[in-house]
Amino acid sequence: YIEEAADLRGANMRTRMLNLMSINSLLKDCKELNRQILFEPVPAGEQFLAPIIEALRDKHAIQMTYQGFDKTHPSTFVVEPYCLKMFKQRWYLLAYSPVKDKTLVYALDRMHEVEITKQKYELPNDFDAEHYFKNAYGVTVLESQPERIIISIDEGQAKYLRTLPLHPSQKETEPINGYPAFSFYLYPS
């Protein structure tokens, strides 16, 4: 299950892919511009997308070697992949850990190895990736209840938020002390 999978199948994704192919072709023809067009680097981990997507499709657990930022050594374990999510140019895997008996988020750029196992699993019938992350900013989902969070910023920054919202729950509210204000319904993190 890939978050926003409907977009992957729809015209929106086809249009995006055609645009990317067109731009890629144009860039190949204009190699002299490579010092004038700058791309944001994508962290490591994209090589694990294909096996993870295959495991999601076939409902097979994966064995991965993973090293979180807080660990001095990587460890190897088996998880059941539930969904992939991209946030701020990084891919994340939400997966159920049978050993810890809970779902956890793993950053693909911290994976060292991924192997599809023969072990089958069932995705819970009530699992909905969009609902799971609905009140999260990024990939941080807390066990606490989401809260209404209000921020007040200067007009220059407000223009950015109006054109590129930080979260789907974002709403512009009444100004606070003359400054634009925005509310969000999120897990406090």
Segments the model singles out, each with a brief description of its role:
Residues 75-77, 102-106, 149, 180:
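Short beta-strand segments
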Residues 84, 114, 172-173:
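A structural signal for short hydrophobic beta-strand segments in well-ordered beta-sheet cores
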Residues 87-91, 98-100, 117-121, 155-159:
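Short, charged/polar surface micro-motifs in flexible loops or helix N-caps
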Residues 131-189:
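Polybasic (Lys/Arg-rich)
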Residues 1-67:
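Bulky hydrophobic/aromatic content
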Residues 53-97:
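Loop-centered beta-sheet repeat module
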